[in-house]
């Protein structure tokens, strides 16, 4: 049965009108672009039949080249040939220099500490370099499909943080692409595999690419996959194999460690060629910088064994997080070109107790999964073929003190999904909490849509902030939202179900998203003001309680100073000056420091009364 589709507004295709979409695997070493044609996902080749595009850009004063042509210049013009730029995305210059000391580029720091690479074309940042790779892939797709792309899905490592993901989005925008979604690489592989297998049970996706390693533990059931746990290492991949082997060759050849960039590139190219050859041969002859020697697979295995072991330790942690044992895993899907290394396949097979699946091309599977997802998101799938994969069109959250909206699940999150967040009580002795579920992108309750209200009762009567309530949002594959609130110490809970998309048209959703962008600056200022007002109310509430209990600890003059500070805070909190409220809060804190210290001393004396030193 087809599901209610929750998707980005305006993406549904008219009858018989097919929109052009592509999936892009923006890899560290190689990149691919794929699309769905005649119901089948396939990667797109260049004019010479090559599907992989080396993630390399060579810059000159009058232009640049991408891919194989660029890689051919790597040894001749190292400083202007940028490769593995994905590793630099979202990182500071200091971080790059610490993590990747082997890079043969000259860097400068921008004003905010971000890296700028010196090239013949000028100073370039990683976003610009990535954009040039994306442009080349988009051009390949546009030519193959004979039309402009309506949208793309770009894959990223599961361990990419917000800065790295935002950098990828910026690169796509610079390349003139409309990003339908960023998709984690292991999830993309699971999409491709889930469509083809028809199996049910726990599956491990072992993704060892050029620059990153990811492990995902998934549960497949009737075509639906649920991510149980993920793990990995954002600074471990086949490139590290290459550098280890290059260092070994350098030592064997007696090449100085500080040799020029051309020799360094020649060493690296020789190492890459040897690694590839050793996947099929027991030994290989290496010629570099006038030296010739033999390297065996056994020697290579000794070099990389510690790195392979690191990946298996990450697998062990992911299994533990998922709550499953290795022998419960039915299949192990291998993703990434580095999984062709025999030692990797051997050790992974030993760890999981079964030979890993290699029937799906490990280089192509991520791009194929991205293409399938792009085809869905752009609106090409008829209802009868809808997958249980969709997105939340508008953020879901809760009303908090001051009329603010705290977003729990952001828009464009893939469903099914569950997210939890902890909240606490605002007043002393509070025994109930009203839960107001909101939908929208704005910062204030008045600008968002109310979905539901319910109350959690039976909260222990504790001081403000003493009770901890965990609120869990869960959206299932049908788009049904369940919200549960539970007081953690007692286990008392309340819940409600609501259909978050019900009653909203595509145009209304689009309008809400547009408003969030138009009023972004205004909303942020309003939120800052509301937060300061909430903090002022909290400070005054706490102070009034303290004065009611222990005013005797103050002299008349001291009490007057505190009362004046509190009155001033109460007055400015009625206005709209954020800085004035903040300063008034700081002033109350300053004027009450001695009072707070006396209250603490008094509490300690009361606690010790009637006890000897030995008892304490």
From Swiss-Prot:
One Pfam family here: HSP70
Top-rank lineage group of the source organism: Bacteria
GO terms of biological process kind: iron-sulfur cluster assembly
Keywords linked to the UniProt accession: ATP-binding, Chaperone, Nucleotide-binding
Single GO MF annotation: unfolded protein binding
Classification via InterPro entries: ATPase_NBD (IPR043129), Heat_shock_70_CS (IPR018181), HscA_NBD (IPR042039), HSP70_C_sf (IPR029048), HSP70_peptide-bd_sf (IPR029047), Hsp_70_fam (IPR013126), ISC_FeS_clus_asmbl_HscA (IPR010236)
Entry keyword annotation includes Chaperone: yes
Entries under Gene3D superfamilies matching the protein: 1.20.1270.10, 3.30.420.40, Actin, Chain A, domain 4, Substrate Binding Domain Of DNAk, Chain A, domain 1
Function: Chaperone involved in the maturation of iron-sulfur cluster-containing proteins. Has a low intrinsic ATPase activity which is markedly stimulated by HscB. Involved in the maturation of IscU.
Family: Belongs to the heat shock protein 70 family.
HAMAP family in UniProt: HscA
The protein, known as: Chaperone protein HscA
Gene that encodes the chain: hscA
